[in-house]
Amino acid sequence: MKKDNPLKTKTAKKIIKEIELQVSENSTLYVEYSNWYCGITNKPNVRKSGHKSKNNKEPAFWKSFNARSVKISLSIETHFHNKGMLDTDDKGGYDKDKSKFIYVYKKHPTILD
């Protein structure tokens, strides 16, 4: 039996489209995925505060989405990491049972942003 591809779900397709739009609308001249960070969490507001503290500034163009499952959120995260979005080196910093939210923000905004 063939395994289902989480990226084929309506939820994943919708979130991918929304993230692409978010990135496109908040990129100067062209999309540079390496200027963006993508991650998953079970508490978007707590995670946003963590990034704010770590980077000493508000995450630019922050947006989070409810992927409805960890499997879907991980698949979307991997999809965008493969496109060049930034990630941390330590995979596994998420709650394997509850991290159904995916979030993105512009890690390296330009002076024109």
Give a label for each model feature.
Residues 1-113:
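GIY-YIG nuclease catalytic motif and its immediate N-terminal context
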